[in-house]
From Swiss-Prot:
Any one of the GO CC terms: cytosol
GO process annotations (BP): gluconeogenesis; glyceraldehyde-3-phosphate biosynthetic process; glycerol catabolic process; glycolytic process
InterPro entries with a match to the protein in the record: Aldolase_TIM (IPR013785), TIM_sf (IPR035990), TrioseP_Isoase_bac/euk (IPR022896), Triosephosphate_isomerase (IPR000652), Triosephosphate_isomerase_AS (IPR020861)
EC id: 5.3.1.1
Swiss-Prot/TrEMBL keywords: Cytoplasm, Gluconeogenesis, Glycolysis, Isomerase
Protein name: Triosephosphate isomerase
Positions bound to substrate: N9, W10, K11, G173, S212, G233, G234
Record's function text: Involved in the gluconeogenesis. Catalyzes stereospecifically the conversion of dihydroxyacetone phosphate (DHAP) to D-glyceraldehyde-3-phosphate (G3P).
Enzyme category, top tier: isomerase
Compartments where found: Cytoplasm
Pathway annotation from the record: Carbohydrate biosynthesis; gluconeogenesis; Carbohydrate degradation; glycolysis; D-glyceraldehyde 3-phosphate from glycerone phosphate: step 1/1
Gene that this polypeptide is encoded by: tpiA
Residues at the catalytic site: H95, E167
């Protein structure tokens, strides 16, 4: 049975005060939660502070991006070795904001995936279609292409112990969200697509939903059989809202 994971992507938000206050509040809100793994991805500059603030809790550290290089003359980048050294575990790659604003290709994201696996870190591979692609009926085609960038170069075994986050681009930060049935259909397609290469691997892959997940829609999303948690944006910056989402995932998967 898959163990749900709810991860907060803080994006470009934070301060020393905010990190300490938010994590302190999360610790209170999430006390006693054992049926759902919880991770947070603050900006890199606050990773060490967040690590100490979360020390002794069940909150696991993550990061929002990684470079393909481990060291060298690559100004402004953060390597997988550095993230591992500081204690990060779940590393987001392929987020639509990186694909759009930084022109990251499927091939580059696949390289990041490989580097993370080599370092023993867990990739959180974001995939998803734009509004235009959705309206053109290309959702499955786009998701398959983004998965195949890894599948065809690294094999199905590369997805062992990995997290995939399906984030329809049209739902990120817009207030729109896929209906539970829509999200489930895509999640099932993703799992079935990997299963064509290896059914056993596909069954254990955690597939999160992302895209305007909030306290109001989380519970219904998590009742779907192939939705294994969420990658949460704005709601992860509020301890009470984030805790509702985590508890909804725990309750749904224990039902």
């Amino acid at each position: 049975m898959r163990h749900p994971l709810v991860m907060g992507n803080w994006k470009l938000n934070g301060s020393r005060h905010m990190v300490n206050e938010l994590i302190a509040n999360l610790r209170k809100e999430l006390a006693g939660v054992t049926g759902c793994a919880v991770a947070i991805a603050p900006p890199d500059i606050y990773l060490d502070l967040a690590k100490h603030a979360a020390d002794g809790s069940h909150i696991v550290l993550g990061a929002q991006n990684v470079d393909v290089n481990l060291s060298g003359a690559f100004t402004g980048e953060t390597s997988a070795e550095m993230l591992k050294d500081i204690g990060a575990k779940y590393i987001i790659i392929g987020h639509s904001e990186r694909r759009t604003y930084h022109k990251e290709s499927d091939e580059l994201i696949a390289k990041k995936f490989a580097v993370l696996k080599e370092q023993g870190l867990i990739p959180v591979l974001c995939i998803g279609e734009t509004e235009a692609e959705n309206e053109a009926g290309k959702t499955e085609e786009v998701c398959a292409r983004q998965i195949d960038a890894v599948l065809k170069t690294q094999g199905a075994s590369a997805f062992e112990g990995v997290v995939i986050a399906y984030e329809p681009v049209w739902a990120i930060g817009t207030g729109k969200s896929a209906t539970p049935a829509q999200a489930q259909a895509v999640h099932k397609f993703i799992r079935d697509h990997i299963a064509k290469a290896d059914a056993k691997v596909a069954e254990q892959v955690i597939i999160q939903y992302g895209g305007s997940v909030n306290a109001a829609n989380a519970a219904e999303l998590f009742t779907q059989p192939d939705i294994d948690g969420a990658l949460v944006g704005g709601a992860s910056l509020k301890a009470d809202a984030f805790a509702v989402i985590v508890k909804a995932a725990e309750a749904a998967k224990q039902a």
